Amino acid sequence: MAEVAFRQLRKQYPPRRGSAAVEVLKGIDLEVRDGEFLVLVGPSGCGKSTLLRLLAGLEAPSQGQVVVAGRDVSALPPSRRDVAMVFQSYALYPHLSVADNIAFGLRRSGHRRLQQQLQDWVARTTGWLRSPREQRIAERVQQVAEMLDLAHLLDRLPKELSGGQKQRVALGRAIARQPAVFLMDEPLSNLDAKLRGDTRRQIVQLQRQLGVTTLYVTHDQVEAMTMGHRIAVLNAG
């Protein structure tokens, strides 16, 4: 868990042919407490998603600082920021099973020697000579799957899942890494009303259970009022 702070954060996109430069964020000062669920609301184009992308390291700020757990991470690559992001589009790997999608971030973390890579590959493809590391990953995947009611779906591919199940897999992939911060960018937009309500309650329950600092972007006022500890309204940067 970690506190998050944006200090005089600005983001400007350079001019394109025939148009001027666009300043999307105009000196944001915002603090998110450790373990807090903060909801960002505002009209389309106001900079909500850009703020998350700056925190995740997917874009660089033009000016200002992004601080996580008291450390300025503005110049760090995404892999060193200890954040996990859930997108509106699920972003699942279609050729990987539910289990492998959940485990993907765990297997990608850190640098492994060739021998360890080969051993893990043998373990996944044959089921024997399972390395201690691969065993820990399998146990973590099972734990997360049970938490999200996905244990009976671990062998399925994304194309065999409903929209709600896909979103739970995306959540599982983020949870499995045990990050310091969760970032959620309109994760329920593609779901129908009933699934949206069910998944909304599940996200809130998981966040309270895990206690992970969470920034959640939505344009839905009902989501904002029912999910967050606090709401931050963003308008025109």
Describe the residue ranges of each PLM region:
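A short, surface-exposed alpha-helical micro-motif characterized by mixed small hydrophobic
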Residues: A224-T226
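Helical segment within the ABC ATPase nucleotide-binding domain
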Residues: G197-L210
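ABC family nucleotide-binding domain
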Residues: A2-L191
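Conserved H-loop
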Residues: G211-V217
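Short, glycine/charged-rich "phosphate-handling" switch motifs in NTP-dependent
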Residues: R230
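ABC-family nucleotide-binding domains
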Residues: D192, R196
